[in-house]
Amino acid sequence: MKLSIVIPTYNEKETLPNLIERLYDEIEPLVEELHVVIVDDSSPDGTADLARNLGKKFHKISVIQRPMKMGLGAAYKDGFNHVLEKLDVDLIVQMDADHSHNPSEIAIMIEKIVDYAYIIASRHVPGSSIVGWNARRQMTHSVAGAIARFSAKIDIKDPTSGFRMFKKETLQRVEFDRIHSDGFAFQIEVLYQLKQKDLRGLEVPTTFVNRVEGESKMGGSEILQFIKMCFSYFGKK
């Protein structure tokens, strides 16, 4: 089984080396081939150059460097399209570079995806935990998730999770040109399409650790985009 991991980055020079090392130490032995795709928005801290240097040590690392900060969702679009067009893989993972997602959990995702179109590492199923969030952050996340589930009619407990695995044929059915969100609302738009196509997913427990290094990708414009997207789903089936 061949696996690709798409990782968007913006000022992740401090966190990326450890993540890449863990992926090649812990996940590469489980698969026939491992490809890592870094999508960097021209980070001022030199993340893209660092990723290229890591590629000299760890084989099969591709770096897509974009001209400016263009958003998390746009990064995933570019990363997924790169994988679908240029790489021969069976499974595709999306994850953050900031240590909030545990690479070792990819193993259980590989095991469970056999009977499903996609897997979500969920913060809201038994066995999950969240480390480092205060009450306000917990509330904001819960409200956003509830609004997304209600508006898009998605039967997923953690629709905003950014740690996911897809079968290649699942992503091939996603119409990326119909996804208008460049930010984190992209996560909801993908799930909405998968639901429309009757593709079944599974949520597995995760331990989510709030980022302690690097730079957050969340901004006010992304929140507004999320609200606009949710309103667009009202009235749709």
Model-derived regions, located:
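Donor nucleotide-sugar binding loop of glycosyltransferases
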Residues: 12-15, 43, 102
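Cell-envelope/extracellular polymer assembly enzymes that use nucleotide-activated donors
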Residues: 2-4, 35, 189
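Catalytic donor-sugar/metal-binding loop of nucleotide-sugar-dependent glycosyltransferases
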Residues: 154-155, 178-182, 191-208
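A conserved acidic beta->alpha catalytic loop
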Residues: 40-49, 68, 99
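Acceptor/aglycone-binding surface of glycosyltransferases and processive sugar-polymer synthases
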Residues: 64-82, 91, 103-184, 211-221, ...
